[in-house]
């Protein structure tokens, strides 16, 4: 029954309606018991005493006819003579519950207030309890002696039409309330069901079909965020497919080249050519090894929760070590590396920061013309650490500049790199809560600027 949200909301709402009706009935009964019962008793007692006064002044010939006439006026009456004989007038009582002690007291001229003294019952309204002890009683003097007269209004007869009206009203109230609860519950559940179907489509890989935002409440907000999530997942899926295609291409091309070189190696007996083929195969396998290393590093950066950033790094010394390591490559192109480094300490991951800065210097050496210069600077600026590396090189188009930090992107098709270096650098800098920017001047000087928070204070 409670397996669906629709049934749960509907049953909860109906239960609330019925429980509210029950509580309302109990509270009404309590209100009658403590506020209305005494005044109701007094009104009926007043009516009965007026009837006795009329009987004593008018002296009707047949007292029974007089009580019968009162019974026809929607009163229930019970008379008891000295011998204990009981006579009923009007509609019959549901049950005779009057005690003999109460009867004797009335015969001895004591008034009886059974309505006022009726004990409280939680689920029984005293006003409607049609029993003989729920009456008022007084002594009547007749020519045949004293009689005890007990009377209460005939609620059933007096309010018969009202009871019918009330019953119809309550039935309609419950029917309409329950119908509206079911309808309103359906209006709430319908967009949730559509959201469920959209989620199932999402699981099946459909990232293109949006759901219509039909409301402005919390469900509408949920629909809006679902569409945003769908778009994000679609982008992630496209990136995944693009990544797989790029990796496949980066691996397939060198493997095809190796296969071709091995075929040539088998068919030639020329020692010079054989050595050249072996050297080419070695170069390609080295590139594949580098690609594998960088892919593993990218995976590590994407799942960085286990990484620690608490190494105390002397950044200026780190840069000097990188320059010394890459000096041979710079000397091969007769490049001059100028470094202006302030003494700066930084708290981070030394291995990753070394990789990021090395990538930038390797790129600068690679794309600087022979005999050119590379300028490196490290300095404080307010609460930040600023690292810049500039070099002379060929200009980069605005289209290429916009995609410079994308994974597997290459500025030139003839570039023998795998296009991951700058993407790795950007990820590392962002994990250190920093930023990296690329600019170029009219003189074809390209500059990478890294800004890191000065966290060594």
Swiss-Prot record:
GO terms for cellular component: plasma membrane. Coiled coil: none annotated. Residues 186-238 form the HAMP domain. It is an enzyme of class 2 (transferase). The chain crosses the membrane at residues 9-29, 164-184. Gene3D superfamilies: 1.10.287.130, 6.10.340.10, Histidine kinase-like ATPase, C-terminal domain. Autophosphorylated. It is a multi-pass membrane protein. InterPro entries: Bact_Sensor_His_Kinase, HAMP_dom, HATPase_C_sf, His_kinase_dom, HisK_dim/P_dom, HisK_dim/P_sf, Sig_transdc_His_kin-like_C. It holds the Pfam family HAMP. Its EC number is 2.7.13.3. It is found in: Cell membrane. One of its GO terms (molecular function) is protein kinase activator activity. It catalyses: ATP + protein L-histidine = ADP + protein N-phospho-L-histidine. One of its GO terms (biological process) is osmosensory signaling via phosphorelay pathway. The modification Phosphohistidine is found at residue 249. Residues 246-456 form the Histidine kinase domain. Keywords: ATP-binding, Cell membrane, Kinase, Membrane, Nucleotide-binding, Phosphoprotein, Transferase, Transmembrane, Transmembrane helix, Two-component regulatory system, Virulence. The keyword Disulfide bond does not apply. Signal peptide: none annotated. Member of the two-component regulatory system HssS/HssR involved in intracellular heme homeostasis and tempering of staphylococcal virulence. HssS functions as a heme sensor histidine kinase which is autophosphorylated at a histidine residue and transfers its phosphate group to an aspartate residue of HssR. HssR/HssS activates the expression of hrtAB, an efflux pump, in response to extracellular heme, hemin, hemoglobin or blood. This is Heme sensor protein HssS. The lineage of its organism: Bacteria, Bacillati, Bacillota, Bacilli, Bacillales. The gene is hssS.
